[in-house]
């Protein structure tokens, strides 16, 4: 249940966030897609931990492919 709610909130962010913010991600997949993949693969707690760590790394000049 927590995973589904989290994924729905992330998808809401993906639809409502300004284009400038959404296009700023330097990683592939995007940080929000990475969070969804991590939640689906590793569950709520570990998935969010991985997603938050990824967001912390999302600073210039970092970037490139980074899969969960």
Swiss-Prot record:
Pfam families noted in UniProt: YidD
InterPro entries assigned to the protein according to its UniProt record, in alphabetical order: Membr_insert_effic_factor_YidD
Domain of life: Viruses
S-S pairs: none
Entry similarity comment: To bacterial proteins yidD.
Protein name: Uncharacterized 7.9 kDa protein in int-C1 intergenic region
Native organism: Haemophilus phage HP1 (strain HP1c1) (Bacteriophage HP1)
């Amino acid at each position: 249940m927590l995973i589904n709610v989290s994924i729905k909130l992330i998808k809401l962010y993906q639809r409502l966030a300004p284009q400038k913010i959404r296009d700023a991600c330097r990683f592939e997949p995007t940080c929000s897609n990475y969070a969804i993949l991590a939640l689906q693969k590793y569950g709520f707690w570990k998935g969010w931990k991985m997603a938050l760590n990824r967001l912390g790394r999302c600073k210039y000049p970092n970037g490139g492919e980074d899969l969960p």
